[in-house]
Amino acid sequence: MKKIWIVAAATNLAFSLSAQDSGVETQAIGVVIDAHAIVDVVDDEIVFDFSADDPAEAGDPFVLGSNKNQTTYLNYSLMLSNGGIDDGMISVRINDMNEGMHMTLLADSSPLASHDANQYGTLGTVAANFDAKIGASPVILNSTDQVLIENIGSSYTGNGAGNGYLLSFTAHINDYSKLDADNGAQDMGTITYTIAE
């Protein structure tokens, strides 16, 4: 029995001597971050209600009142998958706009002015043709995607009203002969925002 104990102790000592730590140790680490691209507008629906804008006198036209101007905020979160090239973008298009009307859009990045790049990342710039800060003329939306925000790196705008890009829409009459009343129901169109890299 004594021999077995001595053999076991010697074996244990041999293993513990070979497994001793050295003065330097390395350890592998892994970090997993999924690429993501999420875009949102604060208001799921913008209603241009012109029911109070009927002409008061015979012979007067129907004229769009103050409700022709509406605003909302565009928010996004983007994690690039391409090694840090700031090539993300958000495009915009409109479908099923009321006949006889069109919609224009301007975007303003002023709400992002205080966002620190170390915290929020590389925020995108408003495409020059949409940029309200440089005095661009409002862009007519159509069914073709148009680049609204460009040069987006891995970043996020913050969520909700007051965060992101201020979008200013204006409704216009472009063909009075095609206008028709909706009798209290609203005609529905769709504005689509697409974020991609």
What do these predicted ranges mean?
Residues 20-133, 138, 145-197:
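N-terminal small/polar-rich segments of proteins
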Residues 4-16:
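Sec-dependent N-terminal signal peptides
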